[in-house]
Amino acid sequence: MNAVNILIGLMPMIGWGIFPVIVGKIGGKPASQILGTTFGTLILAIVVAIFRGTPIPETKTFIFCLISGACWALAQIITFHVFETMGVSRTMPITTGFQLVGASLWGVFVLGNWSSSQSKLIGFTAIALIIIGVYLTAWSEDKSSASKSGAVKGILLLLVGELGYLGYSAFPQAVSADGFQGFLPQAIGMTIVGIIFGLTQTKKDYKPFKEATSYKNIFSGFFFAFAALTYLISAQPSVNGLATGFVLSQTSVIFATIGGIYILKEKKSKKEMIAVMVGLLLVLVAGSVTAFIK
C-alpha cells in the first residue's frame, strides 16, 4: 500500500467528516437539509457519469441501486432530526457505531462471514466494544429527565435509521452492482425521497423549495458525494480493497465529532470530552477489527 493509495483512502474521511459539520453550520430544517444534500449529490453523480461515460445499468440493477439511495435518504432524514436534539458531536459516533455493527451482523448472518468459532468470538467481542464506545460518546453529565429522555429517543431513532443505512449497502450487493454504475441511480433514489419529503413538509409558514438553506446545502451535498465517490475508488482491489477502504473511511467520525465540538460550539464538560474520546477510540479500533476478520 503506497502513500497515494492511503491518501485516496482518507478522502472519504474528509468528505464524510466535514459533511455533517457544514450541514450544521448552514442550518435549516431536515427537509431543507435533505433537499440540498440530495441535489448536490445528484449534480456530482451526473457530472461523473458523463465524464466517465458510465453506462446505465440494466433494469434490475438500476432499480436495486435506486432503492439503495432511497434507503440512505430515509436514514439521513432521521439523522438530521437527531442532530437537532443531540448535536453532531454526539450523533455521529453513535450512528457510525450502529453502521459498523449492522454491517458486521449482515455479513455474518446473510453473507456467511466469520465462519470459524475463533472469528465469531473476536467479531462479537469487537461488536460489544463498539456498543460500549457508542454508550460513552452518548454519555452526559446532565442527569435531568429531559436530557435522558432526549438521548434515549435519539438513540432509538438512530437504530431505526440504521435499517436505511443497511439497505443502502445491501441492495447493491444483492445484484453485484459496480460502484460507479450504481452511483447515479443511487443519487436519483436519494433525490426522489428528498423531493417527496420536502413536499410533505411544505406548509404556509415553511416552504422548503423556497428556503435559501435548501440551496445552500447543495454545497454540503458535494462533500457527501465526493466522499462516496472517493470511497468507490478506494475500495477497488487495485487501490486499498474493500476492508481497508471501509476502515479508512470510518475515520470520518473523528472529523465530524471534533468539528461538532469546536466549529459548531457543542459544549462538553471535561468528563464528557474524555468519554467521547475513549468512545471514539473503541468504535474505530473495534470497527477496524470487524473489517479484517475472515
UniProtKB/Swiss-Prot annotation:
The chain crosses the membrane at residues 2-24, 34-56, 63-82, 92-114, 121-140, 150-172, 179-198, 218-235, 242-264, 274-293. GO terms for molecular function: carbohydrate transmembrane transporter activity. It is found in: Cell membrane. It is a multi-pass membrane protein. Keywords: Cell membrane, Membrane, Sugar transport, Transmembrane, Transmembrane helix, Transport. InterPro entries: Sugar_transport. One of its GO terms (cellular component) is plasma membrane. Belongs to the GRP transporter (TC 2.A.7.5) family. This is Putative ribose uptake protein RbsU. It comes from Latilactobacillus sakei subsp. sakei (strain 23K). The lineage of its organism: Bacteria, Bacillati, Bacillota, Bacilli, Lactobacillales. The gene is rbsU.
